[in-house]
Design a protein with these regions (language model features):
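Active-site metal-coordination/substrate-binding segment of hydrolases
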Residues: 13, 81-159, 164, 184, ...
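A short glycine/serine-rich beta->alpha loop
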Residues: 125-134, 171, 217-223, 374, ...
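Phosphate/diphosphate-binding glycine-rich loops and adjacent basic-rich segments that engage nucleotide
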Residues: 187-232
């Protein structure tokens, strides 16, 4: 069924929801998140409180914003579907801090030919001064529009729960998720991109922090004083990273090592890296590369090099394979919406990968958003509406 994409009333509601959400500044901060601040920015509360008010107005039940800025609500099954499985849908409220998400000025293009080759499509894009925020406000809009349908139209549907989370972009989106409120045995994140994407496999993700300790002395007497410059230790380490393991040289199922940020003085330097792979074996190989390079720089310079690894999230494929119902239900929903399934690996992670680790299998579905995290970001209204159709089809499945 295509109850949103073929209904002008609800497509207009979807567009209005999306435009309203992207105008709300809700950028997170990776720097603050790494310091333990949660949520990492105060503006995420503005988005949370807006959604709380809107969920309440829809007639959703048990609407709450937790003390950690998670928005939760549920809605009971219709009388004829009391025995159906409850389903949880999730989307994240924050936008990435790499490109500004403040004062977003969305541009509406009523001819999608140059974007989706569909003249009837409506495209929402940016004025090139900020990102758009389709990641993941397109997901929020798709969920909210589907909820508007089931709370106002007479229809048979299963019980539904929703969670809108903070700090997904910082990698901390599930750190304080209120699992005690969740009744559903499985869930879906609405945080994908291209039309038809259904993602059941993601990276194993680790971070590495490399600390370099040198020896400072007066620069005029550095030779006599035995200066060991941590700036040069850092540079030497970076120069030794294998080019064929960089993000810009990998694709598909290939993993990578990504240097993300660094700081340095003569006496000390710090480098943060991301390690990504679909297999634990390759992750171990990447860790080994880092350790060998650390030892090499230490031996060459006489300074001290230490490495700390931290697990961020794991590939969700194994857990989803153990729970076929969650995938079967969404595949059926795609077919009913006349959308071809494109089951591709996520070269990243979602809140769903963390939730899957916690025992709630959670694949990811598309939103119709493109060119994330950039000033060229854009969304297709027709595809966003299809995502909303699929949410409803999941809820209608007995």
């Amino acid at each position: 069924m295509n109850l949103i994409s073929e209904n002008q009333k609800y497509k207009t509601l979807l567009l209005n929801n999306f435009i309203r959400y992207v105008k709300i500044w809700s950028e997170s901060s990776g720097e603050q998140a790494e310091k333990g601040v949660f949520p990492s920015t105060p503006q995420q509360w503005d988005m949370a409180n807006t959604l709380k008010d809107e969920l309440t107005a829809l007639g959703m039940q048990n609407v709450t914003v937790t003390d950690k800025c998670y928005v939760y609500a549920n809605y009971p099954a219709s009388d004829d579907m009391q025995n159906s499985d409850s389903v949880l849908f999730l989307a994240h409220m924050d936008t990435v801090d790499e490109v500004s998400g403040k004062n977003v000025n969305p541009q509406i293009i009523n001819d999608g030919t140059n974007f989706t080759k569909d003249k009837t499509d409506t495209i929402i894009t940016t004025d090139k001064k900020t990102l758009l925020g389709g990641d993941d406000k397109a997901g929020i809009a798709a969920i909210m529009t589907a909820l508007a349908y089931i709370t106002s139209e007479k229809c048979s549907h299963s019980a539904v729960e929703v969670i809108f989370s903070p700090d997904e972009e910082t990698g901390h989106g599930m750190d304080f998720v209120p699992t005690e409120l969740i009744k559903s045995k499985y869930a879906y994140t609405v945080d994908g991109g291209d039309l038809g994407e259904m993602e059941t496999e993601c990276f194993n993700a680790w971070s590495a922090t490399v600390n370099f300790t040198g020896k400072a002395c007066h620069t005029g007497y550095a030779k006599k004083g035995g200066m060991i410059n941590a700036n040069l230790m850092l540079a030497s380490f970076l120069s030794k990273l294998p080019v064929n393991k960089m993000p810009q040289t990998t694709e598909g199922f290939e993993g990578f090592i990504a240097p993300m940020e660094s700081s340095a003085t003569i006496e000390s330097a710090t480098l943060n890296l991301l390690l990504r792979s679909f297999s634990n074996t390759e992750i171990d190989e990447e860790k080994n590369i880092i350790m060998k390079l650390a030892d090499k720089v230490k031996d060459e310079t006489g300074g001290l090099v230490t490495v700390t690894f931290k697990q961020q999230y794991l590939n969700m494929k194994e857990k989803l394979d153990e729970n076929p119902r969650v995938v079967e239900r969404v595949v059926k929903a795609f077919k009913e919406a006349n959308v071809n399934v494109v089951n591709s690996p996520i070269r990243g992670g979602t809140d769903g990968s963390r939730l899957t680790e916690m025992g709630i299998p959670t694949p990811n579905i598309f939103t119709g958003s493109y060119e994330f995290h950039s000033r060229n970001e854009w969304c297709s209204l027709n595809q966003m509406a299809k995502a909303s159709d699929i949410i409803l089809n999941i809820l209608f499945d007995k």
